[in-house]
Amino acid sequence: MKKTARLLLLCICLLLAGCTAQTAPQPIQPEPDTQPEQAVQPARTWQDIQAQLPDVSAMSGFPAAEQAWHPEPIVVHGEEAEYWIDQSESWETARICMRKDGQTASIYAAQDGSLSQLALFDGMLYFAQIGGIYRMPMEGGAAELWIPGGGRFALTGGVIYTWLSEQGFCAIAAQDPEQAVPVWKQEQALTIKQTVPVTGGIVFWLAENEPDPDAGQLWVVLLRNSGQWELLREETGPMPRSIFSDDTNVWFMRETSEGQFLYQIDCKDGAYACLGKLPEAPDGCYSPGTPVLGFQRLLMRYQGIESTMEFYALDDKLTLGEHLLSYGADDSYAIYFLHLFEIQETPQSFYFCGKSEENGLYLVSEIRKSGDRLLREEALQPPV
């Protein structure tokens, strides 16, 4: 009996030992790496150099960007007044005019004719002139040289973006003239060729500082209101003849030996496409509506829709380079012998800039809107 019990106990121990051996965890063998090592190639994208850029929105003293403004507006609107650059006397003279409470006055004059690019922020006017970027109070007064050496610039959210010879492409807080914060300094000097506003940011066309102003490597760069940069396009070739934008797209024209072609860049995903060749009118003017000075949103959106816009040119389209005809609120035609250069749309008005063939002066005309009708038209004239 005892022998049988011992034998049975021995069998049980052997069975338990076997089960333990089967359930013991086995060491995990590392799987061989089947993917070969990939060499990291430096890609020339804006994201690759983004590490060099501080976040503009995180800088102390920088307000959040509200809305991009047109780089060279015809008229700048303040809360109680509107401002514009008048060059009607001659190309050699230019002045800033202000209209407030129906009264017009000249608040700044430049004798060298270099006055350009008017912008408004926090009670101050900013403009470019020979020597740099100036600023002055909105009501007039002494103008101070604020950014020596600054040239073309863009202002959004209280931050001016420009190119300086020593700092390269940089951002400067408009509300603090003592603060200059370089945003990006590349080994090769870049210059701003053009800026256009889009929903949520500004598109900059940057180019290498080549002897030929129309040549060099071009970067189409989007600065969003959050302070983030994106490279939309990089290419080599001549500078586009005209650049303009609508809400979310950048349009530009490029002239080749085969004619002029229209291109589009989608600012949401960077998609790039050539939309085709523009037809050429018998008089040599590209039709329909050749944009030439940056803001042609009105042309692209309302071109040929006569009943909606109630604007006409000689060929029933609003065409730059042609005489401008407008359909008045009293159902009568009004012919303006104005060689049309630029158009700007605001919620209240349309502004037209052109050269009068009657006296050769460069004028700005305003047409106010009332609902779907044209209410009133007047010329923004400098003070006598």
Tell where the protein language model's regions lie, with residue ranges.
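Residue position within the beta-strands of beta-propeller blades
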Residues: W84, F127, Y161-W163, F204-L206, ...
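Beta-strand-rich domains and repeat architectures in extracellular enzymes and scaffolds
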Residues: S57-A94, A110-Q117
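Structural motif
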Residues: S90-C97, G132-Y134, E166-I172, E210-V221, ...
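Bacterial signal peptide processing site
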Residues: T20-Q22
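Repeated scaffold domains used in trafficking and secretory/extracellular systems
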Residues: A68-H77, G113-F121, P148-G157, Q188-T199, ...
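C-terminal motif of bacterial Sec signal peptides marking the signal peptidase cleavage site
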Residues: L15-G18
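A short beta-strand motif characteristic of beta-propeller blades
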Residues: S57-A65, Q103-A109, G141-I147, Q179-Q186, ...
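Short loop/turn segments that connect beta-strands within beta-propeller blades
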Residues: R99-Q103, P137-G141, A173-E178, L223-G227, ...
